């Protein structure tokens, strides 16, 4: 992820946490499938994301609850597994989708700046409040499309 803003105290989307039996995960239906998603709802969790993972098991992933609805840019920093990303507005409408490809890791001769500059950015292109990362190929497998609604109410 490229940038990030602080959380406001009145962010109603964080109520999702109170509805889950496990405060670190959320069960969500995406298309016809049920997923167990890790929640990234704090600055540290958003920055960490799925970095360092070698794979993403079927029907799992991560739901990012961003501090505000705006254009979001994600990257595959230290991510070793391809994945799909769904960008959703505050109403749960898919505004953009990407298949994000794993990048080669930073090598010992590469500066941090050069490493970051070579990473591809995946943009929501329109304001998004939520980002869902799921296993690669699930967008196609589930026949998801821009404009489709994902019910985020629990």
Q: Where are the language model's segments positioned?
A:
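Short acidic, low-complexity intrinsically disordered linear motifs used
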Residues: 1-10
């Amino acid at each position: 992820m490229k940038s990030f803003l602080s959380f406001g105290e009145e962010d109603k989307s964080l109520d999702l946490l109170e509805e889950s039996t496990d405060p670190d995960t959320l069960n969500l239906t995406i298309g016809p499938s049920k997923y167990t998603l890790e929640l990234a709802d704090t600055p540290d969790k958003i920055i960490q994301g799925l970095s360092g993972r070698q794979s993403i098991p079927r029907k799992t992933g991560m739901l990012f609850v961003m501090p505000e609805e705006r254009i979001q840019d994600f990257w595959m920093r230290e991510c070793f597994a391809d994945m799909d990303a769904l960008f959703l507005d505050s109403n749960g409408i898919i505004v953009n989708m990407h298949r994000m490809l794993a990048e080669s890791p930073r090598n010992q001769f590469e500066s941090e700046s050069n490493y970051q500059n070579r990473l591809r950015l995946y943009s929501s292109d329109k304001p998004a409040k939520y980002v869902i990362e799921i296993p690669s190929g699930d967008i196609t497998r589930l026949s998801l499309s821009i404009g489709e609604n994902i019910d985020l109410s629990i």
